[in-house]
UniProtKB/Swiss-Prot annotation:
Enzyme class label: lyase
Similarity comment text for this entry: Belongs to the LeuD family. LeuD type 2 subfamily.
Organism of this sequence: Maridesulfovibrio salexigens (strain ATCC 14822 / DSM 2638 / NCIMB 8403 / VKM B-1763)
InterPro entries reported in the protein's UniProt record: Aconitase/3IPM_dehydase_swvl, AconitaseA/IPMdHydase_ssu_swvl, IPMI_Swivel, LeuD, LeuD_type2/HacB/DmdB
A Pfam family the protein falls into: Aconitase_C
Protein name from the UniProt record: 3-isopropylmalate dehydratase small subunit
HAMAP family: LeuD_type2
Length: 164
């Protein structure tokens, strides 16, 4: 579970309406949602992002309404991991349930600048800032959550478990 990409910083208290505005909730198609990811924060934000880039957020990322569309839109934008100072609890569970890797790093998020090149190892709980040479640590993804991620989300995980 190692990912290399460019860091894209967003602020504090980014709610699910900023991640994917309500006017785009007419679908659950990841590509359609991804094309409008973060549209409530910055029009055209998606044009700056490449596959496997990494979102870095301040505190309370994903607050607001409980909707699966928010993590689906992030994944649809090609972003496999969000690193944040902290997450809203309901978003944290929804994110993993949809297959999005989420890592909490506390105040160390300040060491990850916009545009920095990062290498994230979610299994080890390490984030290397290739740009600065600094490595920060966080709690690794727990084994149960890794199982969900390996299957691509909770629904596929349950299907896999039931088939055995």
């Amino acid at each position: 579970m190692s990912i290399k990409g460019t860091a894209y910083r967003v602020g504090a208290h980014i709610d699910t309406d900023a991640i994917i505005p309500a006017r785009f909730l007419v679908t659950t198609d990841p590509d359609e949602l991804g094309a409008n990811c973060m549209e409530g924060l910055e029009a055209g934000w998606i044009k700056r992002v490449k596959k496997n880039d990494i979102m870095v957020a301040d505190e309370n990322f994903g607050c607001g309404s409980s909707r699966e569309h928010a993590p689906i839109s992030i994944l649809g934008a090609g972003i496999p991991v969000v690193v944040a100072k902290s997450f809203a609890r309901i978003f944290y569970r929804n994110g993993f349930n949809m297959g999005l890797i989420l890592l909490e790093v506390g105040d160390d998020f300040e060491k990850l600048g916009d545009g920095d090149q990062l290498e994230v190892d979610a299994e080890k709980g390490e984030i290397k800032n290739v740009t600065t040479g600094e490595t920060i640590t966080c709690a690794p993804v727990p084994p149960f959550m890794k199982g969900i991620l390996d299957c691509g989300g909770l629904v596929e995980y349950v299907k896999d478990r039931l088939s055995k």
